[in-house]
Amino acid sequence: MNTTPVIPADEAVIVMTRIYEAPRDLVWEAMTEARHVAQWWGGPGFSNPVCEMDVRPGGLWRHVMRFPDGHELKMNFVFVEVDPPRRLAWREVGHAERKGGLPSCLITVSLEDMGERTGWKMVARFDSIPERDAALAMGFIGPIAASNDRLVDYLRSL
């Protein structure tokens, strides 16, 4: 099943959903342990030479994503909410120093236990509808959908 986006006209959010063919505990582990995240984050051909995660409220997630052409994007996130294995929320920090970066948003991922399957719902909450629209214009959805496709393949390998 593909990642499905919903963009409400009257709310500064992007909502994406997907069903994973894996139990919730395994999906949670793959999303919260750096050794796993480094294997699937980013689109095809991307790698993650640095992925350090302190998964607790206030904890830092430091990430360097290498594009297929070799250039790197450094990202830092702070975890806002951690409720294993149900909810995980984070916000990028330091993005203002990065020229041309996406507008800041709070990402909240909810995992629904469906037995041997897991319902995944991501809500990206922006400060305003114009910021949300700017993120959409910059291609916000594509990389998340591509990462989710890689996560599907990675979960099959576990």
Q: For each predicted feature, which ranges?
A:
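Short beta-edge strand/loop motif at the mouth of beta-sheet-based domains
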Residues: 15, 35-72
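Hydrophobic/aromatic beta-strand elements that line small-molecule binding cavities or substrate pockets
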Residues: 18, 50-53, 75-81, 92, ...
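A short, structured loop/turn motif at beta-sheet edges
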Residues: 24-25, 55-56, 80-87, 110-119
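Short, highly charged C-terminal tails/helix-capping segments
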Residues: 50, 156-158
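Helix-adjacent hinge/juxtasegments
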Residues: 60-91
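Beta-strand/loop substructures that line and gate deep hydrophobic ligand-binding cavities in soluble
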Residues: 91-142
